[in-house]
Amino acid sequence: MSLLREAERCLVNRKAFASLNAFVTPLDRVGSWIERVKDADARRKRGAPKSSLDGKLIAIKDNICTRDVRTTCASAILENFTSPFNATVVELLEESGAIVAGKTNLDEFGMGSHSTYSHFGPVKGVRADDLGYVSAGGSSGGSAIAVATEQCYAALGTDTGGSVRLPAAYTGTVGFKPSYGLLSRWGVVAYANSLDTVGIIGANTSTVSEVFGVLNRYDHRDPTSISKATRSRIDEITGSTSKTRSERLRIGVPIEYNILELDPFVRETWRKSIQHLKNQGHTVHPVSLPATKQALSAYYVLAPAEASSNLAKYDGVRYGTRDLDSPDNTGGYLYARSRGSGFGPEVKRRIVLGAFSLSAEAIDNYFIQAQKVRRLVQSDFNKVFRLHNPLLQATLTSHPKALESDGDTAEKVDVLVCPTAPSPPPLLCSLENAAPTEAYTNDVFTVPASLAGLPALSVPVTPGDREQESPLGIQVIGQFGDDQLVLDVGSRLEKMNIQ
């Protein structure tokens, strides 16, 4: 099939699934992109494509800046904002020949777990018979639905505490959060700087790997981008240990993830996924991550604290839509009404929560303690992986000792395998009267990897005896920089029939 025909098929699907509300700003049916796709077709026929993404439609989450399309963050305060520049990841996609397929819907400023907190209306998952629509997950729900319904080849999202992996788990797609700092954040509207990661959603791990290969570049404009020297060291460490680990991997199963609230179908899918890897010749080992129990609480202190600082600039003066001054505004705050009407309820909730945790009265008891928990979470992961964390000082002097981490390496594992979400996607109607904080628990399995900055992948798995059921997300977590191994293990789960 020609690239132009593929693009036209995506547009047909977009019209067919318009009710799911995946896009804030869709790609126009006519425009200069058509000629670019035709040029890509010609290059492919000559055997000289720019990349494997040449001429492919890639959707962009609407909190990633694009010069030619508005960037709203699904918020009223940025409803008419158009960036004067492209984000680095968008630049890299366009240099590879990819076509921006529009901007996808999300929870406002990336704050949510079901993509319902959007100024442009909620994103809807597939219908569950006569019960209504199910959740598409959040906050990158629009990107996930766009991929799941073949409205694009792949999509970019952002993952702060699971915002790419959870939608992937709910929509039967593959969602990948790379190691923190590998993909540039320059041009990505910040939610929580120390956690935000550009993620990739695709129909399979092969597609995700293609996009990752294009975007995995150092960017001098991003102060959190991993330097070229560190990238070389990571490549040397992971390359030198790949032969040591060989094809027989040690698969870790975190015992703390087997919680009482875990849905029985999710638990059974997890068990069969582990058995499937065991049948392939890999060994399975229980591991303990004790700080995991405090990870979710720490996350919902740290992320809102950073958000309250990042969102202070949206006042209608420097950024954002300016609302009319209120006649009863006796406090003299020029921006009070602009922020009050511009932000939605969940964003306001997190701003207040973050401002409190950073206050002089609370910072020691909340923010500082949460930072300590974060370090404990990172330490727990470092203790269970055979590969030493390349960012630690020990690797600076002698990378051949990369496997000599704390304790006996024979007892350590290569990757962790666990559920992505504790339950299948809920019905949207069931969320209407639920307490806002109930949605926070959906991130319980995704937050730990985010706090530690580790690569994590959600792949759809359907047990062979439950093929009538929608697939569930199984998560693969690896050591920092071991992104390729995470993708490899994910492909083994994805391709095989789990019995």
Swiss-Prot record:
InterPro entries, per database record: Amidase (IPR000120), Amidase_dom (IPR023631), AS_sf (IPR036928), GatA (IPR004412)
Q: Which reaction does it catalyse?
A: L-glutamyl-tRNA(Gln) + L-glutamine + ATP + H2O = L-glutaminyl-tRNA(Gln) + L-glutamate + ADP + phosphate + H(+)
Instruction: Cite the SUPFAM superfamilies for this sequence.
Output: Amidase signature (AS) enzymes (SSF75304)
- Entries under Pfam families matching the protein: Amidase
Q: What EC number(s) does the entry state?
A: 6.3.5.7
Residues at the active site? 61, 139, 163
* Localization per Swiss-Prot or TrEMBL: Mitochondrion
Tell me a GO biological process for this protein.
mitochondrial translation
Q: Which cysteines are joined by disulfide bonds?
A: none
How does this protein assemble? Subunit of the heterotrimeric GatCAB amidotransferase (AdT) complex, composed of A, B and C subunits.
Output the PANTHER family linked to this UniProt entry: GLUTAMYL-TRNA(GLN) AMIDOTRANSFERASE SUBUNIT A, MITOCHONDRIAL (PTHR11895:SF7), TRANSAMIDASE (PTHR11895)
Q: What is the official name of this protein in its record?
A: Glutamyl-tRNA(Gln) amidotransferase subunit A, mitochondrial
Q: Taxonomic lineage per UniProt?
A: Eukaryota, Fungi, Dikarya, Ascomycota, Pezizomycotina
